[in-house]
A protein has these predicted regions:
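Canonical P-loop GTPase G-domain recognition
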Residues: 115-118, 123-176
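Conserved nucleotide-binding/hydrolysis micro-motifs of P-loop NTPases
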Residues: 37-39, 62-64, 96-98, 123-128, ...
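Well-ordered alpha-helical segments embedded in enzymatic catalytic cores
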Residues: 74-81, 102-106, 157
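Conserved Switch II/interswitch segment of TRAFAC-class P-loop GTPases
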Residues: 83-104, 114-131
Length: 194
């Protein structure tokens, strides 16, 4: 797995702990963290090494799909670039808040990418919240990881699955599919026997 070509984007709505998770995974405080929404506006890149594997990690600002204000629109654009560049998306949700309307919108957006999505149910720092984080399975993605980025709870399991998913993605990209659809276009002037 080549870290320069293997990228993982951390995405989610504002104030769910994306930058805290980013800092935890890269092992240093690179992204600014605060209680106010909209602190992270541009993409922030870092390198992660886990279980002998390296990959690039991208922190994004909080996504608000239907906000027409200039700053949120730019954040959405920056997040879109990160999503396009990545082979895997880590969707951070707030386990304390539960599912919100914005989470519903983001689920549809992330599903439309066709990329693998791992849900990190952040702020899960009690057994009750860990149990309640299973509600995020309702979005139809394969994995929900109850974590606390601040306290490093569940982060190792999330990293294990990131590495495993990236290894499968790299193998799948390297092997052409036998069922790949062939597209053919026959073009020419009208009435020439195409």
């Amino acid at each position: 797995m080549d870290s320069k070509n293997t990228q993982v984007a951390i995405v989610g709505r504002p104030n769910v702990g994306k930058s805290t998770l980013f800092n935890r995974l890269v092992g240093e405080r690179r992204a600014i963290v605060g209680d106010e929404p909209g602190i992270t506006r541009d993409r922030i890149y870092g390198e992660v090494e886990w279980a002998g594997r390296k990959f690039s990690l991208i922190d994004t600002g909080g996504i608000v799909p239907d906000d027409d204000a200039v700053i949120p629109a730019n954040i959405l654009k920056q997040a879109g670039v990160a999503i396009d560049q990545s082979q895997l998306l880590v969707w951070v949700v707030d386990a304390r808040a539960g599912i919100t309307q914005l989470d519903e919108e983001l689920a549809a957006l992330l599903r439309s990418t066709g990329k693998p999505v791992l849900i990190a149910a952040n702020k899960t720092d009690s057994a009750k919240l860990e149990s309640e984080s299973t509600e995020f399975f309702r979005f139809g993605f394969d994995d929900v990881f109850p974590i606390s980025a601040e306290q490093s709870i569940g982060v190792g399991e999330l990293l294990d699955r990131i590495v495993e998913t990236l290894e499968h993605a790299v193998v799948d990209d390297a092997e052409p599919s036998a069922s790949a659809e062939l597209r053919l276009a026959i073009v020419g002037r009208p009435n020439v026997g195409k």
